[in-house]
From Swiss-Prot:
<feature type="binding site">
    <location>
        <begin position="184"/>
        <end position="187"/>
    </location>
    <ligand>
        <name>ATP</name>
    </ligand>
</feature>
<dbReference type="GO" id="GO:0005524">
    <property type="term" value="F:ATP binding"/>
</dbReference>
<feature type="active site" description="Proton donor">
    <location>
        <position position="37"/>
    </location>
</feature>
<dbReference type="GO" id="GO:0004592">
    <property type="term" value="F:pantoate-beta-alanine ligase activity"/>
</dbReference>
<dbReference type="GO" id="GO:0015940">
    <property type="term" value="P:pantothenate biosynthetic process"/>
</dbReference>
<dbReference type="InterPro" id="IPR003721">
    <property type="entry name" value="Pantoate_ligase"/>
</dbReference>
<feature type="binding site">
    <location>
        <position position="176"/>
    </location>
    <ligand>
        <name>ATP</name>
    </ligand>
</feature>
<dbReference type="InterPro" id="IPR004821">
    <property type="entry name" value="Cyt_trans-like"/>
</dbReference>
<comment type="subunit">
    <text>Homodimer.</text>
</comment>
<keyword id="KW-0547">Nucleotide-binding</keyword>
<feature type="binding site">
    <location>
        <position position="61"/>
    </location>
    <ligand>
        <name>beta-alanine</name>
    </ligand>
</feature>
<comment type="similarity">
    <text>Belongs to the pantothenate synthetase family.</text>
</comment>
<dbReference type="InterPro" id="IPR014729">
    <property type="entry name" value="Rossmann-like_a/b/a_fold"/>
</dbReference>
<dbReference type="Pfam" id="PF02569">
    <property type="entry name" value="Pantoate_ligase"/>
</dbReference>
<keyword id="KW-0963">Cytoplasm</keyword>
<comment type="function">
    <text>Catalyzes the condensation of pantoate with beta-alanine in an ATP-dependent reaction via a pantoyl-adenylate intermediate.</text>
</comment>
<dbReference type="GO" id="GO:0005829">
    <property type="term" value="C:cytosol"/>
</dbReference>
Length: 281
């Protein structure tokens, strides 16, 4: 397994693979890898001749009061996981390599970023789409793999790739959970013992919503009330948003008549966690 830090060096390797007509699976990450990332890597390994993982904590997708400086980093642990699951190359550029000068060009995806995390984290998806455009141009992958836990990100990236004619297939992979139901996340590392226990309220509230939907509740406000009521019973939980949107357009719905995404963002102490599920009628 190679670990490469420069665009020049990684492009030389990519060119060699492309000259040999090898397919490339790409897993973009910010590092501090866990079983959720491992599931993406395994899927990429099954479907491609070569697998690349990028590890880059992207400064332009963080807001001024967010956790860029404290985001967990552990390249040794990450490298071990990548090697275990058969990654061929880790691309781990410095910030100065990706952004050597002040950046004036940005990628925006409208409409799909109006709600959910796009509303609550202004500029976040502009940063995500801009850095992914750079990575797609640098690495030229055949397929790229994203977790469904970041459901809005997955929808936004799919639309960007479609609109800008990137010759890349975007693959969504299911949420990976702890045994007790908490969605795997690098930010779970921030939680102390009590917060970790309290964080289970996210999955529990979504399960109650799913039960109501399966009992044919069609009013989205009633579903949201169920989630909010459950979350408010946890003293350490502070709701950022509870949203029910069309699973394709990500626009809010009142009456549930088509597939929906039920998505929540909740602060447990100072840690912001997200979770979701898709419900198909």
């Amino acid at each position: 397994m190679n670990i490469v830090n420069t665009i020049k060096d990684v492009r030389l390797i990519i060119k060699k693979w492309k000259d040999e007509n090898l397919s490339i699976g790409y897993v973009p990450t910010m590092g501090y890898l866990h079983e959720g990332h491992a599931s993406l890597i395994k899927k990429a390994r099954e479907e491609n001749d070569k697998v690349i993982v990028s590890i880059f904590v992207n400064p332009i997708q963080f807001g001024p009061k967010e956790d860029y400086s404290t985001y967990p980093r552990d390249l040794v642990k990450d490298s071990s996981l990548c090697e275990k699951f058969g990654v061929d190359l880790i691309f781990n550029p410095e910030t100065s390599e990706m952004y050597p000068n002040k950046i004036y060009s940005h990628i925006n995806v409208d409409i799909l970023t109006e709600n959910l995390c796009g509303e609550k984290r202004p500029g976040h998806f502009q940063g995500v789409c801009t850095v992914l455009t750079k990575f797609f141009n640098i690495l030229n992958p055949t397929k790229a793999y994203f977790g469904e836990k970041d459901a809005q990100q997955l929808a936004v990236v799919r639309k960007m790739v479609e609109d800008l004619n990137f010759p890349i297939e975007i693959i969504g992979c299911p949420i990976i959970r702890e045994d007790d139901g908490l969605a795997k996340s690098s930010r779970n590392a921030y939680l102390n013992k009590q917060e970790r226990k309290s964080a289970l309220i996210l999955n529990k509230s979504l399960k109650e919503a799913l039960n109501a939907l399966e009992s044919e509740e069609k009013n989205s406000n009633n579903i949201k009330d169920i989630i909010v009521s459950k979350l408010n019973k946890e003293p350490l939980a502070k709701i950022d948003y509870v949203s029910i949107v069309d699973s394709i357009t990500l626009q809010s719905v009142e009456k549930i008549q088509s597939p929906i995404l039920v998505a929540i963002a909740v602060y447990i102490g100072k840690t912001r966690l997200i979770d979701n599920f898709t419900f198909k009628l």
